[in-house]
Swiss-Prot record:
Subunit relationships: Homodimer.
Protein name per UniProt: Stilbene synthase 6
Active site, UniProt feature: C164
Pathway(s) it belongs to: Phytoalexin biosynthesis; 3,4',5-trihydroxystilbene biosynthesis; 3,4',5-trihydroxystilbene from trans-4-coumarate: step 2/2
Organism: Vitis vinifera (Grape)
Gene that specifies this protein: STS
Gene3D superfamilies: 3.40.47.10
Top-rank taxon, per record: Eukaryota
Length: 392
């Protein structure tokens, strides 16, 4: 008879969790930042607020965003005007839209990841789903499992209302699942739509205005597993370690409250400073065991909370400008998609590496870091190891 220790050891994988495929998706409706102030003040019936519109236009100009994809259309706002009003009761209709669209958008990204992976979906043993958009029972994970036709025995983890750091959280969770369940293949999906936070402008809520200028809709998916079969699977990045911490006395720095009016968003002006002043401690704790202290020797996947955060991190760590190129590209093309962002950036990183004929999926470098920042103020740190690129 096997001992408990032998039984437990037999359940564990031998190697590190590895990302095996990536997929991303957005809604069809695209808005351009150059004329978004005109659009936003028109659809929210706020064109009389001329000075606030000028202020909002300046925020948009400084955002470094070219375009975003947003599920809400002008026609939908005409049909449901309370969504576009400032602080009008609207949670019911928001929830009705969200609970249908979040799983659907997640499905689109998941199908792309599954297609790239190339294996039968019956091999998916675990599903980790994350969204800040809406809550229901059974959750978006259950709906997605049914939309994809996953096995009824798939083991599901549903993460609600984690916010922008959760792209790191889902990878940390998937790593634990893959490494502690031999043969596991974990489908990870982040799906975010701004229906939950969209509302009209107010002079008394400038932090809400910042959110209206930054956030976009998108979904991303990865498949994670240990001990990949390289004859049929293509490893992209290894998840070497993962950690989470929160900055003391910063609970209100980034915050959201789900109320009758939807999800309200609150932001302290010193968030870029809080993050940049604490990020090196996270790097040191993560990379000291590997003997790495040169942050420019890493490839970087950082949640693009906004240009001010990226600029502050870049300056504090003396990073070369090219280090955050992939992050800035995703911010420019999609805006801040909350939890979905870092997986978009991973996708951009590996595509850029292959296109540039780099030696590894990490722009030719071996080691990298993935950061998520969000409410708490919480920081997720994931140490990545790239994979040599294979050219046919």
């Amino acid at each position: 008879m096997a001992s408990v220790e032998e039984f437990r050891n037999a359940q564990r994988a031998k190697g590190p969790a590895t990302i095996l495929a990536i997929g991303t998706a957005t809604p069809d409706h695209c808005v351009y930042q150059s004329d978004y102030a005109d659009y936003y003040f028109r659809v929210t019936k706020s064109e009389h607020m001329t000075e606030l519109k000028k202020k909002f236009n300046r925020i948009c100009d400084k955002s470094m965003i070219k375009k975003r994809y947003i599920h809400l259309t002008e026609e939908m706002l005409e049909e449901h005007p309370n969504i576009g009003a400032y602080m009008a009761p609207s949670l019911n209709i928001r929830q009705e839209i969200i609970t249908a669209e979040v799983p659907r958008l997640g499905r689109d990204a998941a199908l792309k990841a599954l297609k790239e992976w190339g294996q039968p979906k019956s091999k998916i043993t675990h599903l980790v789903f994350c969204t800040t958009s809406g809550v229901e029972m059974p959750g978006a994970d259950y709906k997605l499992a049914n939309l994809l036709g996953l096995e009824t025995s798939v083991r599901r983890v549903m993460l609600y209302h984690q916010g922008c750091y959760a792209g790191g959280t889902v990878l940390r969770t998937a790593k634990d699942l893959a490494e502690n369940n031999a043969g596991a293949r974990v489908l990870v999906v982040c799906s975010e739509i701004t229906v939950v936070t969209f509302r009209g402008p107010s002079e008394d809520a400038l932090d809400s205005l910042v959110g209206q200028a930054l956030f976009g809709d998108g979904s991303s998916a990865v498949i994670v597993g240990s001990d990949p079969d390289v004859s049929i699977e293509r490893p992209l990045f290894q998840l070497v370690s993962a950690a989470q911490t929160f900055i003391p006395n910063s609970a209100g720095a980034i915050a959201g409250n789900l109320r009758e009016v939807g999800l309200t968003f609150h932001l302290w002006p010193n968030v870029p400073t809080l993050i940049s002043e604490n990020i090196e401690k996270c790097l040191t704790q993560a990379f000291d065991p590997l003997g790495i202290s040169d942050w420019n020797s890493l490839f970087w996947i950082a949640h693009p909370g906004g240009p001010a955060i990226l600029d502050a991190v870049e300056a504090k760590l003396n990073l070369e400008k090219k280090k955050l190129e992939a992050t800035r590209h995703v911010l420019s093309e999609y805006g801040n998609m909350s939890s979905a962002c870092v997986l978009f950036i991973l996708d951009e990183m590996r595509k850029k590496s292959l296109k540039g004929e780099n030696a590894t999926t990490g722009e030719g470098l071996d080691w990298g870091v993935l950061f998520g920042f969000g409410p708490g103020l919480t920081i997720e740190t994931v140490v990545l190891h790239s994979i040599p690129t294979v050219t046919n």
